[in-house]
UniProtKB/Swiss-Prot annotation:
This is ATP synthase subunit b. The chain crosses the membrane at residues 7-27. F(1)F(0) ATP synthase produces ATP from ADP in the presence of a proton or sodium gradient. F-type ATPases consist of two structural domains, F(1) containing the extramembraneous catalytic core and F(0) containing the membrane proton channel, linked together by a central stalk and a peripheral stalk. During catalysis, ATP synthesis in the catalytic domain of F(1) is coupled via a rotary mechanism of the central stalk subunits to proton translocation. NCBIfam families: ATP_synt_b, PRK05759.1-2, PRK05759.1-4. Belongs to the ATPase B chain family. GO terms for cellular component: plasma membrane; proton-transporting ATP synthase complex. It is a single-pass membrane protein. F-type ATPases have 2 components, F(1) - the catalytic core - and F(0) - the membrane proton channel. F(1) has five subunits: alpha(3), beta(3), gamma(1), delta(1), epsilon(1). F(0) has three main subunits: a(1), b(2) and c(10-14). The alpha and beta chains form an alternating ring which encloses part of the gamma chain. F(1) is attached to F(0) by a central stalk formed by the gamma and epsilon chains, while a peripheral stalk is formed by the delta and b chains. One of its GO terms (molecular function) is proton-transporting ATP synthase activity, rotational mechanism. It comes from Idiomarina loihiensis (strain ATCC BAA-735 / DSM 15497 / L2-TR). It is found in: Cell inner membrane. Pfam families: ATP-synt_B (PF00430).
Amino acid sequence: MNINATLIGQTIAFIVFVWFCMKFVWPPIIKAIEERQKKIADGLNAGERAQKDLEKAQQEIAEQLKEAKQQAAEIIEQSKKRGAKIVEEETQRGHEEREKIVAAGHEEVAAERNRVREELRKQVAVLAVSGAQKIIEREIDKDAHSDIVEKLVAEL
């Protein structure tokens, strides 16, 4: 019976040892393992969140860059249109100014022409009166008349 008493003693010691381990040793080990699992899970979740945030930030940056390029293209297009419009307006204004200057020149030439004609008429009238006086003062014969007309033509 010695084997039985030893076996029973070992069994009781083993049961006490298991109970002691389950009561005092096992809970801190399980707690440490669970904390480590939680830290690892939190780290993985944080990594996934960071990856998602990074992707989201990259998408936002891409969208903002696209919008900025679009706005820049619109600004450039508006500037080109505005520049073309200014050039066209200035060209039109230049043409109008040129037309005004040409018209003023034509008017000035026409006025000068009319003034010269009027002056010429006055001179012709004076010469005609002078010629008529000379004809009346002289005897009217054909030769004298021809001389006077030739002199008048020479004076003109």
